[in-house]
Amino acid sequence: MFSAFLISNTIAAGSSDSSSSNTETKYDMAVTHIKVAKKFEEKDKVEKAKKRYEKAQKLLLQSNKKYPNKVDTLNYLGFTTRKLGDFEKGEKYYLQGLKIDHKHIGINEYLGELYVATNRHNLAVERLEVLKSCNCKEYDDLKAIIAGKKVSKY
């Protein structure tokens, strides 16, 4: 009886570990590429940043295909897609994420920035309203971007 319990727990642990680490690995690798891309942007190394965003996007697409509708994955898919110049598709990823979690801080900030970049300030203000109660730097950043006091770094 005890050995059957031990075997079933070992099998269960093995199956859950492999599926979750796969998602984390692709997602984590993508996040690393995004962080490096942001550093390249700060140094005006635009082409190097673009290549990193492309790598990140590819990993995020793979992760989203295998494990769809993870809000953080959709947030970064929206971000990388926007950074690669496809605002329309980036917006779709953000909106898909908001259907799952309408108060997601990252999505609301980045989508607000996208709306400012595409001259839809009224929609950016709506994102700001969602962030109003978060007591977070994302609220302050988006507020400053909407007011024209700050330019979006990303």
Walk through the language-model features, giving the residues of each:
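Terminal, low-structured helical/coil segments at or just beyond the last alpha-helical repeat
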Residues: 15-24, 125-154
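Structural marker of alpha-solenoid helical repeat scaffolds
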Residues: 66, 100, 131-134
